[in-house]
Regions:
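Short cysteine-rich clusters marking metal-coordination/redox-active sites
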Residues: 166-169, 181-183, 191, 377-380, ...
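Structural microenvironment flanking redox-active thiols in thiol-disulfide oxidoreductases
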Residues: 46-81, 97-98, 264-298, 314-315
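Conserved redox-active cysteine motifs that mediate thiol-disulfide chemistry
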Residues: 28, 34-54, 252-269
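Cys/His-rich, Zn2+-coordinating zinc-finger modules
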Residues: 189-214, 387, 399-425
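Thioredoxin-like thiol-disulfide oxidoreductase module
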Residues: 71-111, 119, 288-323
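Non-catalytic, surface beta->alpha helical segment in thiol-disulfide oxidoreductase systems
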Residues: 92, 104-148, 321-361
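Canonical RING-type zinc finger of E3 ubiquitin-protein ligases
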Residues: 173-184, 384-395
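A short beta-strand-turn-helix
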Residues: 2-30, 221-248
Length: 425
């Protein structure tokens, strides 16, 4: 009843699909794979899942199966995408059932892998994450009626790493102290129990708890040195806050990001201009680039020091893996003066840098000045929206600036409250 009477499966040639009775799934654990060809994360995940599924097929064929639930926009996209998959599929024409399944399992974001027991009970809605963390082991444990991930109640003062799993015991969310490797190619995360049991090829560091205030020495403990802009010359990390520095800006950006490439030269010009009048303010670059060549080419365009590419993981996690470009301003004691440094610079220009150079906060922006980072007006296309923002709940991802709101809209609009300094937009 959940999936209807018939599903699709590839015939022996693999070039076409035949219809089969849904009854063939009786007694099996079934994973519903919500995915779409237009979605890059889906196109990245599907071949990995397909490879694991094929490897496990002989062992699990009587216990486990996957059904593709398409979020594609047309039949031809569905047909093309389904050819990459070795499992069954809900017919594309059954759009009503897609809507029902999507609502029932709250599958709003793709890819999603919802694993159901033979009786239809949900085993896990974190199938994608479990496969990413444990590969074939996830598929092997689901037919036992178990989710790979588990957790426990946090004790007083323990931090909950909501979207992180221990790569040894699979505790997710990971509770308490978290250790990991700063190398980009390593995704290891260890809880305090598994840390002593692990022999990792690279040194491990302890992650810092977001929103807790640390000294600059503690924040940069995992950074062995800083790089000068146009060379491989190394500078001691502590020089960043020495010589009466009142505040530092941590600048997250990447060469592949076009808003970053627009923001960086403007910020660099202001920074060079401010060095005489605001010597108490410094910036350090934390790269979100994916390779050394891009990293080195991009930092050469900047007049400030840089954190090495393989020493940035702790800072990124402390600031919640920020959208880029982002500029966080910290005072000399490690407290945050601004989480919105980039909009502050857009609003106040060099005065922002001078204020931070005195170790002071900028006054909060007036409603008509507030910049809604990464929000575009769907009326006049202002990007980002500056001033009051209105949202249409009926349309979903639909926002208007104050000028366009006055022109009217077919559905009711809600004024979005201006976030405080520590609030998320």
């Amino acid at each position: 009843e959940l999936l209807g009477e018939q599903l699709l499966q590839h015939n022996e040639s693999g070039n076409d699909s035949d219809k089969m009775s849904t009854d063939q799934l009786n007694g099996k654990t079934v994973a519903l794979y919500f995915s779409a060809h237009w979605c890059p994360p889906c196109r990245d995940f599907t071949p990995k899942l397909a490879e694991i599924f094929k490897e496990s097929h002989n062992e699990l064929k009587d216990k486990f199966d996957i059904v593709f639930i398409s979020y594609d926009n047309d039949q031809s996209s569905f047909d093309k995408y389904y050819k990459e998959m070795p499992w069954k599929a809900l017919p594309y024409s059954d759009r009503d059932r897609l809507k029902t399944l999507s609502e029932k399992f709250n599958a709003k974001i793709v890819p999603a892998l919802i694993v159901l027991s033979p009786t239809g009970d949900k085993i896990t809605s974190n199938g994608v994450e479990e496969v990413r963390v444990a590969s074939k082991k996830a598929l092997e444990i689901w037919p036992q009626g178990k989710s790979l991930f588990w957790s426990r109640e946090p004790r007083e003062g323990e931090y909950v790493w909501q979207y992180t799993a221990c790569t040894v015991c699979y505790m997710r969310p990971l509770i308490g102290s978290r250790h990991g490797c700063t190398h980009q190619e390593c995704s290891i995360a260890l809880c305090e129990t598994c840390l002593p049991k692990n022999n990792h090829e690279h040194p491990l560091v302890e992650y810092l708890m977001p929103k807790r205030t640390y000294s600059l020495e503690a924040l940069f403990k995992s950074v062995p040195y800083l790089l000068n802009p146009k060379s491989e010359e190394k500078t001691e990390t502590k020089t960043l806050w020495q010589n009466d520095v009142k505040s530092i800006g941590i600048y997250f950006c990447a060469h592949w990001c076009s808003p970053c490439r627009d923001s960086t030269p403007k910020l660099a010009e202001l920074y060079k201009e401010a060095q005489e009048s605001a010597p108490g303010f410094r910036i350090v670059f934390v790269s979100c680039d994916r390779d050394e060549e891009s990293f080195n080419n991009y930092r050469a365009e900047m007049p400030w020091l840089t954190v090495p590419l393989n020493a940035s993981a702790v800072l990124k996690e402390y600031f919640w893996d920020p959208d880029i470009p982002s500029l966080y301003i910290l005072s000399s004691d490690g407290s945050i003066l601004s989480r919105r440094g980039r909009p502050d610079v857009s609003r106040k220009g060099i005065e922002a840098l001078k204020t931070w150079g005195r170790g002071e906060k900028l006054p909060a922006p007036l409603p008509e000045e507030y910049e809604w980072s990464y929000v575009r007006c769907d009326g006049c296309k202002m990007d980002p929206v500056i001033g009051q923002r209105y949202h249409c709940e009926t349309c979903g991802n639909y926002d208007l600036c104050s000028a366009c709101e006055k022109k009217g809209h077919e559905h009711p609009l809600e004024l979005v409250p201006q976030p405080g300094e520590d609030d998320e937009e």
